[in-house]
A protein has these predicted regions:
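Conserved class I S-adenosyl-L-methionine
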Residues: 2-62
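Class I SAM-dependent methyltransferase SAM/SAH-binding core
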Residues: 66-119
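A conserved beta-strand element that flanks and buttresses the S-adenosyl-L-methionine
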Residues: 130
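Short catalytic micro-motifs in class I SAM-dependent methyltransferases
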Residues: 133-137
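A short glycine-rich, Lys/Arg-flanked "PGG" loop and its adjoining helix->strand segment in the class I
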Residues: 144-156
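C-terminal alpha-helical "lid/dimerization" subdomain adjacent to the S-adenosyl-L-methionine
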Residues: 163-213
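Core SAM-dependent methyltransferase catalytic element
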Residues: 216-244
């Protein structure tokens, strides 16, 4: 993104390029490997304790029906969703991410789709829609229309489940705010290149409010200092019988 304040469309296009470039090393941050390795034992303990909480949450989701994974990446969450799923559709905009996911997971129940989630239309109905570290990459102006669209993909009684970063006083730890640009524009650096992408940090209450504005009731918890997780369901409309 060059010249002036980046538009959301420019940010999203560069975000796709960033994750295409990051695909070979994406999981290093989660597992504290490579350039993300640290000797801080206290940090390592807290990080691993909290990632274990996320994994237990995902492992206990009801995946027996049709499952849709948004921005599936290289398989970090697909590996936990696929074993118990009836059928899993994994979508990402990055071909390199999908290739690494397919190689890592190697499960015939997983159907891979390369698509831009913000322009994608689906005919299917899913019992569970899962988003791992994707909510924080949705621009504010895209939030409500995106989740209204996802609501059409949910089967009756269907659930959205998610894990993501949580807001904290030290956020963002990785990447820099774009000076004078929109609050959700952040610069990420990778192997000598810079990418300006969308990155937002929610607190549980602000995420509940954001989902509410899109027509969902959300239940959000934190793991402690690093992450949040939870579920969201469509708000039940008052029936005609309740009108007085």
């Amino acid at each position: 993104v060059t010249g002036g304040d980046p538009s959301d469309e420019e940010l999203l296009a560069e975000q796709i390029r960033y994750y295409e470039a990051r695909a070979p090393v994406y999981e290093q941050l989660y597992f504290l490997r490579g350039t993300h390795a640290t000797d801080d034992e206290a940090f390592i303990r807290s990080w691993r304790r909290e990632t274990s909480t996320l994994e237990r949450f995902v492992e206990h989701l009801d995946t027996n029906g049709d499952v849709l994974e948004l921005a599936c990446g290289n398989g970090l969450w697909t590996r936990l969703l696929a074993p118990g799923s009836g059928r899993l559709t994994a979508i990402d905009s990055s071909m390199r991410m999908l290739e690494r996911n397919r190689e890592w997971i190697a499960d015939p129940r997983v159907r891979y789709v390369r698509a831009d989630l913000f322009t994608l239309e689906l005919d299917g109905r899913f019992d569970l829609v899962f988003a791992g570290f994707f909510l924080s990459h949705i621009p504010p102006g895209h939030w409500r229309p995106f989740w209204v669209k996802v609501a059409r993909w949910l089967a009756p009684g269907g659930t959205i489940a998610f894990v993501d970063d949580v807001w904290g006083p030290d956020r963002p730890r990785s990447g820099d705010r774009v000076s004078g640009g929109p609050e959700h524009a952040h610069v990420r650096r990778l192997e000598g290149s810079s990418f300006t992408i969308v990155k937002r940090f929610f607190r549980p209450d602000t995420l509940v409010e954001a989902f509410g504005q899109a027509g969902f009731d959300a239940d959000v918890s934190t793991t402690g200092a690093h992450f949040l997780f939870g579920t969201a369901r469509r708000v039940r409309r008052a029936s005609a019988m309740s009108r007085g």
